[in-house]
UniProtKB/Swiss-Prot annotation:
Any GO BP annotation: heterochromatin formation
Modification N6-(beta-hydroxybutyryl)lysine occurs at: K10, K14, K37, K96, K119
Modified residues (Citrulline): R4
GO cellular component assignments: extracellular exosome; nucleosome; nucleus
Chain residue ranges for the region called Disordered: 1-22
Protein name: Histone H2A type 1-H
């Protein structure tokens, strides 16, 4: 009889995510879904979510690296909002990109105007 089912057929290939194909950690499929549901355009190309996920991943990695350095400088092992604030505000390009962004519990950059600092007086007077 010929009704033996799928014995000799090809096995289905193991599913591979679009994120792994692109070599990314950020979810390409989720970004694609959000682009479609967000009414940004009538149609969304196949490369757009990959590109956007890559950009978001790069920016996140950049901020986290600088924040990790700030945490290490403060002898801490956990990144807190203060470290994110210091990382962003001390980097010229990130500060320009996120200039209007307020980070909760971030504090401010330490800055004292030069005119407010005590004047240096000449301590070594020549003996007459």
């Amino acid at each position: 009889m010929s009704g033996r089912g799928k014995q000799g057929g090809k096995a289905r290939a193991k599913a591979k995510t679009r994120s792994s194909r692109a070599g990314l950690q950020f979810p390409v499929g989720r970004v694609h879904r959000l682009l479609r549901k967000g009414n940004y355009a009538e149609r969304v190309g196949a490369g757009a979510p990959v590109y956007l996920a890559a950009v978001l991943e790069y920016l996140t990695a950049e901020i986290l690296e600088l924040a990790g350095n700030a945490a290490r400088d403060n002898k801490k092992t956990r990144i807190i909002p203060r470290h994110l604030q210091l990382a962003i505000r001390n980097d010229e390009e990130l500060n320009k990109l996120l200039g209007k962004v307020t980070i909760a519990q971030g504090g401010v950059l330490p800055n004292i105007q030069a005119v407010l600092l005590p004047k240096k007086t000449e301590s070594h007077h020549k003996a007459k």
